[in-house]
Amino acid sequence: MNKHDFPKIHFYEQDFVDIYNKTWTWLYSSWIDPKTEETIPDGYFIHPTNGNYVIDQFESILSSFFLVYSNRNYDANKNIDYFYSKQEESGAIRWRYDLKTGQPILDSSNPEGVGLPLFAWAEFNLYHKSANKRRIKDVMPILQKYMEWIDATFKQENGLYAAPASASTMFNSPRDNVRYAIDFNAAVAINASH
């Protein structure tokens, strides 16, 4: 696959070791170039649904936490960098983009397209695994502008954030008429602490 081996684990239960090794193999089929629709290591880490190539903020952030362990076989920050490249003048970074058109995917349940603001948490993890100080210097202005947009758009007088419930991506936990969702406000706190 690539020039580096994936990290090896030694565990008394061989079935777990086999699953671990197979997981790295399965990941290869999820690195897709949306323009050519080919599976390539330099593509984006996505799972096409119904022929649509959608990059999701929450999935991209969470995937960076395990991709850092691939010994650079996979780029842990490529998906995140895509979101940074789409930052608007206002500071907005939308939660989903169509990779073929580059356009944000917005709907009536989340007209601003805000996702859980956890980019700083992901960057904190990336820094602790790679010690890339240059990256911190490069992304800090993006993250600051993003948080300024979140404050200006969703922060209320009481200090809490009133984002749409769908921004949490917890569709299996519906909450009608929620105003200050704890998951979104907790994500803001986690993001601010990193």
Describe each region flagged by the PLM.
Residues 27, 147-151, 192:
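A structural signal for well-ordered alpha-helices, especially hydrophobic packing surfaces
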Residues 183-194:
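Active-site neighborhood of glycoside hydrolase catalytic domains
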Residues 53-159, 181-185:
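Aromatic-rich carbohydrate-recognition surfaces in CAZymes
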Residues 31-36, 151-163:
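Proline-centered turn/helix-capping motifs that create local helix->coil transitions or kinks
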Residues 1-55, 75-78, 82:
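Low-complexity, Ser/Thr/Pro/Gly-enriched N-terminal "stalk/linker" regions
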Residues 8-10, 65-66, 178:
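Second-shell loop/turn segments in exported
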Residues 156-176:
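Short, flexible helix-coil linker/hinge segments at the edges of structured domains or between repeats
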Residues 43-51, 103-106, 171-182:
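Active-site-adjacent structural elements in folded domains
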